[in-house]
Amino acid sequence: MAKKSLIAKAKRTPKFGVRTYNRCPICGRPRAYLRKFGICRICFRSMALKGELPGVVKSSW
């Protein structure tokens, strides 16, 4: 889990807009962020397997 100070720092508006970065609102992870869903890949996988994300199905071929 991310440090609380880093999560709070990411919520503030930076001096320059380029410095803005996305964090997962559930766990605070800054990497592997999926913009379409607004969460990280780990939270996405767990929520998709639980069926909490509508329209997401596990693929098989």
Swiss-Prot record:
The keyword Zinc applies. It comes from the Bacteria. Keywords: Metal-binding, Ribonucleoprotein, Ribosomal protein, RNA-binding, rRNA-binding, Zinc. Zn(2+) binds at C24, C27, C40, C43. Its cofactor is Zn(2+). GO terms for cellular component: cytoplasm; small ribosomal subunit. Pfam families: Ribosomal_S14. One of its GO terms (molecular function) is rRNA binding. PROSITE patterns: RIBOSOMAL_S14 (PS00527). Binds 16S rRNA, required for the assembly of 30S particles and may also be responsible for determining the conformation of the 16S rRNA at the A site. Part of the 30S ribosomal subunit. Contacts proteins S3 and S10. Belongs to the universal ribosomal protein uS14 family. Zinc-binding uS14 subfamily. HAMAP family: Ribosomal_uS14_2_B. This is Small ribosomal subunit protein uS14.
